[in-house]
Amino acid sequence: MTRSLFLLLASACWAQQPPAPLTFPHQTEADWVAHDFTFHSGEKLAELRMHYITVGVPARDASGHVSNAVIVMHGTGGSGRAFLSAGFGGELFREGQPLDAATHYIILPDDVGHGKSSKPSDGLRAKFPHYDYEDMVRAEYALVHDGLRVDHLRLVMGTSMGAMHTWIWGELYPDFMDALMPLASAPVEIAGRNRMFRAMIIQAIRNDPEWKNGEYTKPPEQGLIAAQYALWMMTSSALQLHKTNPTHEKADAAVAALRERAIRTDANDMLYYFEASTDYDPSPGLEKIKAPLYAVNSADDEVNPPELGILEREIKRVPHGRYILLPTSDETRGHGTHSRPVVWKQYLIELLKESDRHAALLNPRHEFWAQSAPEAFHVKLATTQGDFTIEVHRDWAPLGAARFYNLVRAGFYDNSRFYRVVPNYIAQFGIAGDPAVAAVWRSESLADDPASQHNVRGTVAYAMTGPNARTTQIYINLKDNLQNDPQGFAPFGRVTEGWSVVEKLYGGYAENSGGGMRAGKQAPLFEGGNAYLDREFPRLDRLLSAQVL
């Protein structure tokens, strides 16, 4: 087989067999058995074998929890071994790469029905229990939690079918992971052309006279060939097919080689692959996903064509979701782009950084908060009125400056609201837009700093209900407010650029949208977050992002 033909076959969502897997540090391969596993169909297996490869070693924190585990799930018809290739593992697991095997514990399972895990071709054939995607995810979870004794995942990532599993993981086990990255998928029911080509594959096998309800003595070759043709055309890239097969002779040879591969595939295994996706539909539960999620698709993916606009619509329902569409290029491979980290690796790096910050936001004891602040630094705040800059001096209020520095680093203030703007008095912000984050920090009080500066126009300080009660809320003095000095309000910085932006922040609601801090009237802001403020006070300006310069 030529290299170009191999690359084409490998781009198919279920054809992921690398020519020469690499070996990584502490690489092991084994089986784990789940006993008396019950499927959604009601069928049971006394012993469900889950084959897996692991790379690296688990690291445990002071509480004994695994902190560096990653699961990567393969596509339809694939296996975990596919991820050991130079093109995938070489880009991600080597020294200095985002999932460096020296610092991560990487779990590569063979899914139910696939690879060396339990599957119809082991002997049960058509009597093998009918599994669906949720069954497969429950088996993955059992392997991770019960088999490998991992109680938390740093990252859940999958390609194609594995990407669809990633959405399900986020809904079934929302507190089990720090980040999710589905590659080449959509979080909705499989319908339209996607379902049609799957139905063609299923019917091609079932309608072959040799199939005999799965008890064939001779492989149903014509059905398998027709199924493979449909699959290949959907999962390949028109650009790459033309580049690697520029003559009719090469194109015909590629089809002939594809035919030979098709007849070596077990028909029952293949049928089960595609029937498992029939009831897939995570769309009703997208709001349950808690961890940051980056959904990555490519513009030349015929299985998940971007013109349908599905992910643009659905990602808005994922609390910390982001959709990335990779443009067609010489590096993309249609649906198979999911297995080319060289194209999308930079987004994995961004996701891991964001999820680190997100984990810190939910845990005030996280090591993230130990970072000391510089003696002086500048923070740029991007708002719906424009940008302005705060210059912070640590010696003005050391504790307050340090917390502000780290809150900005963590993204605490990003996508929040200026909820209390009282003209000719103050502009206040600092309640997180995510109620889960806001609740964590609501009572994380700081000891007072001595007030070394006056509350003059342009200075910034923490709002508080009394002594030693500073948390995250910040106000900007819109005029000289010297009456605040004897009450212990200690400025830690001042606005040095963009004062006209501060003056334009919407103040029409005054105290009504977020005042009453001392009277305990801010509960709706903490409990409802941005959703409450946007519904009740839609004209409030937004703090889009805060960045240490």
Give residue spans per PLM region.
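Cyclophilin-like peptidyl-prolyl cis-trans isomerases
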Residues: 360-549
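Conserved hydrolase catalytic core segment
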Residues: 151-195
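Conserved alpha/beta-hydrolase "acid-adjacent" motif
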Residues: 302-310
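Short beta-strand/loop motif that positions the catalytic acidic residue
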Residues: 289, 295-297
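Alpha/beta-hydrolase-fold enzymes
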Residues: 176-260
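Catalytic active-site module of serine/aspartate enzymes centered on a nucleophile-bearing elbow/loop
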Residues: 318-360
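Conserved acidic catalytic loop of the alpha/beta-hydrolase fold
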Residues: 134-155, 172
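N-terminal cap/lid subdomain of alpha/beta-hydrolase-fold enzymes
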Residues: 53-122
